[in-house]
A protein has these predicted regions:
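Long, polar/charge-rich, low-hydrophobicity segments
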Residues: 321, 469, 474-476, 480-507, ...
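Short coil/turn connectors between adjacent alpha-helices in alpha-solenoid helical repeat scaffolds
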Residues: 230-239, 451-454, 519-524, 595-597
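Extended, hydrophobic alpha-helical segments in both membrane/secreted and soluble proteins
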Residues: 59-63, 261, 265, 286-289, ...
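Replace the tail clause
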Residues: 1-450, 558, 607-729
Length: 729
């Protein structure tokens, strides 16, 4: 357990009972904050005051800056308390609220982000907004005090103008969500257009896409890998996709955006070379990037991809998990206080000298580019550790053996990491979010199979069982939060807020349950996936829109608060995989197992709803492209039956090469009976609980390969299995 540096302030406003880490961190502020809810809106309307809405996160550096500069300033607080009803929202806890006001502020100012600062009518419609405002005018931005007085004046003296602006903004975001995007064709050509849009932005020198700032885009990376490994040798995009995927993964893991000492990725890079990151670490980034590196190793057996994947798992295990109960924590902050910018993660040359003996220092300084002049604007002596060369390239350049350099690297890494652990540690938000945990479960189960890590499998299943027990009622209700981060003054073991699950929570959890069945053969996971998928359709799918909304329709006779009245159909990955393609993909997986054609029909209709516009989303359409591949390609199920070395060899062959439409499981023979496996597999493989085509006599292990609803005879030979799994087979 690592000590987090985070205040436990005395409550001075309406956040005294808040469960969210971000809201709890503001309890001491002189601003009379209120949580999002009926009471705050009723007060605004009864006093006819506009609302000041702050949306941020506990990991957000500029949120902390604005807190200290403005919200902890008594003069600013007096202005807010006099003229506004102040509402504070945690974007991790309420992604539905955040998404709508991000769209609104982007329509007003041309950009969104955190902190989000919006001025609303008493009923919650935005009439002005922006992101970070300094207390006093600088950075080309107006001072926050002047902004507050201006917005109060607009509401008091130019109310019609404010109401017209609010109506225009709401009409804009509702129009953007009411599009009819059908009209394209659901073919692999559409997938190619999405990939071509991403490849046009590929940076061949540094990897990644675009210039700066640079984000990883895991969805588009997996789509490029799918094209690189599963298209025919004459496909013109395959080679380009291969280069883009491998270059990007290599450059990211060598950059400062990757924690060279402990593993794990920071949120994004401020430069095109991946050197200087925003230092917060997010669970969802690391789980999706873990899948990228596992899939890369699965396909190309690249040792650096393996090393990065294992290091991500070790970092998550060490810092971001509840080892006893199961569960993955949400995030780690970038900073200790506002006067540093990633100081916990960075090093001056003198700091490195104090830890390393001369030989290791000489190596570390060259390998990680540690010098007198560093990389950070606030302290030019601070270096972000990054690698300009691989260890093999470094060995060739220096004349040393790679084995000797590996010894130096391991020793220097251990010493620097031990010294870093003595520093005050950035706060870890130990809130356990349902959707993000489902993503982590998927990543761990994939890694466990490909990398043969039983510990990852065991922890993923412990977490999945906890999710089923604590976030799901066993029927239609799934909560957004499994458990909040514990607090010394408010012990929290179960959610105090019953935040309903979003589409993404349901869709990611259905995927995790399907993966739970593939990992164990236990039918409880399969049956739960079916039940939750049905609930997802009932709650979020619209027959009129032929797509999924991100939240449930309001109950009859009720009106959603504020901008929640605008319905959203998420299709772009930003930053997690989008809800509609994720839900469609989950339904396609279940259709392949259950034979329930309505799942396929809904998935196809959903993808068709966006087919006329999705190619324009480029980097943000990776999940859509993968879901479309899954729709167009026959599912491939590989079931390895048996145990021992023969089964292990067959399983190793089966998992080689990533393919979106392929799933692999190893199962005990006693489960291969009617009722012991999903309906389609039972129909294809069994006849009156006996194999339709029995395995060879005496075979201790064999593989069953099913494409669609056609299964090959049992395979015992490794070479025959390789041939059966060729993309053109």
């Amino acid at each position: 357990m690592h000590k987090d540096v985070s205040p436990t302030p005395t409550a001075a406003n309406g956040l005294e009972s808040a469960a969210s880490s971000y809201l709890r961190s503001a309890r001491h502020q002189p601003v009379k904050w209120r949580p999002w809810g009926e009471a705050a809106f009723a007060l605004a309307q009864s006093e006819n005051k506009p609302i000041l809405l702050d949306i941020g996160a506990v990991w957000c550096h500029w949120c902390h800056v604005m807190d200290r500069e403005s919200y902890e300033d008594h003069e600013i607080a007096e202005l807010i308390n006099e003229h506004f009803i102040a509402i504070k929202v945690d974007r991790d806890e309420r992604p539905d609220v955040d998404a709508r006001y991000q769209a609104a502020v982007s329509a007003i100012s041309g950009q969104g982000g955190w902190p989000l600062t919006a001025f609303l009518t008493p009923d919650g419609r935005p009439y002005f907004g922006g992101t970070y405002f300094p207390r006093d005018e600088r950075y080309g931005r107006p001072g926050f005090g002047r902004v507050l007085l201006t917005m109060a004046s607009v509401w008091r003296d130019r109310r019609e103008e404010a109401l017209e602006s609010a109506a225009s903004v709401m009409a804009s975001i509702e129009h953007n969500e009411s599009f009819s995007g059908s009209g394209g064709e659901l073919t692999l050509a559409l997938v190619d257009k999405i990939a071509a849009s991403a490849l046009a932005q590929f940076d061949p020198r540094n990897g990644g896409f675009g210039s700066q700032p640079k984000f990883p885009h895991p969805g588009i990376l997996d789509l490029l890998l799918e094209i690189a490994t599963n298209r025919g040798p004459g496909d013109p995009q395959a080679a380009q996709a291969h280069t883009a995927f491998c270059t990007t993964l290599a450059k990211m893991s060598r950059g400062g955006v990757y924690d060279q000492l402990a593993g794990g990725f920071h949120r994004y890079s401020v430069d095109e070379r991946w050197v200087v990151p925003h230092f917060e670490k997010m669970l969802y980034d690391n789980t999706e990037l873990l899948r990228n590196y596992v899939h890369g190793f699965q396909s190309f057996v690249h040792p650096d991809f393996l090393e990065t994947a294992v290091e991500i798992i070790h970092w998550l295990d060490d810092w971001m998990t509840d080892r006893e109960l199961g569960g993955f924590c949400a995030s780690q902050d970038a900073d200790i206080n506002l006067d540093d910018d990633g100081d916990y993660f960075t090093w001056t040359l003198d700091e490195a000298k104090a830890v390393l003996p001369p030989t290791e220092l000489e190596f570390a300084a060259r390998y990680w580019d540690i010098g007198e002049l560093g990389d950070m604007h606030h302290n030019p002596a601070k270096n972000v550790l990054h690698r300009k060369q691989t260890l093999t390239e470094f060995a060739a350049a220096t004349g040393h053996s790679e084995e000797y350099l590996r010894m130096l690297l391991d020793s220097a890494q251990r010493k620097l990491l031990a010294a870093r652990r003595l520093r005050p540690t950035p706060f870890v938000d130990r809130t356990i979010y349902t959707g993000w945990n489902a993503m982590a479960i998927r990543a761990y189960l994939e890694a466990a199979r490909v990398l043969r890590m039983d510990s990852a499998r065991d922890f993923a299943l412990r977490t999945l069982n906890r999710l089923m027990a604590e976030a799901w009622d066993g029927d239609a209700e799934l909560r957004h939060v499994i458990a909040y981060s514990p607090d010394d003054s408010i012990p929290v073991s179960t959610p105090q807020e019953n935040v309903p699950g979003t589409l993404e929570d349901y869709a990611f959890t259905v995927h995790a349950l399907v993966d739970g069945w593939f990992a164990t053969g236990e039918m409880k996971f399969y049956h739960a996936a079916i039940k939750l998928a049905d609930a997802m359709i009932a709650r979020f799918y619209s027959l009129d829109a032929e797509a999924f909304y991100d939240t449930a329709a309001p109950a009859p006779g009720t009106a959603p608060l504020g901008a929640l009245g605008a319905r959203r159909k998420p299709v772009q990955d930003a930053p997690t995989p989008a809800g509609n393609p994720t839900a469609a993909s989950a339904l396609l997986r279940l259709e392949a197992l259950s034979g329930r054609n309505e799942y396929r029909e809904i998935a196809e209709a959903t993808l068709n709803s966006f087919s006329g516009i999705v190619e324009h989303f480029g980097l943000y359409a990776g999940s859509y492209g993968l879901a479309l591949e899954r729709l167009l390609l026959d599912p491939v199920q590989v079931i390895v039956v048996g145990s021992g070395p023969d089964a292990a060899r067959l399983e190793a062959v089966a998992v080689a090469r990533f393919a979106i439409n392929k799933t692999v499981m190893r199962i005990a023979s006693f489960r291969l009976v009617a009722g012991g496996i999903p309906e389609v597999l039972a129909e294809s493989l069994l006849q009156e609980s006996e194999f339709r085509v029995p395995p060879p006599p005496g075979a201790e292990a064999f593989a069953l390969v099913c494409r669609g609803r056609t299964c090959l005879p049992p395979i015992t030979d490794v070479e025959a299995l390789v041939e059966a799994l060729e993309p053109s087979a």
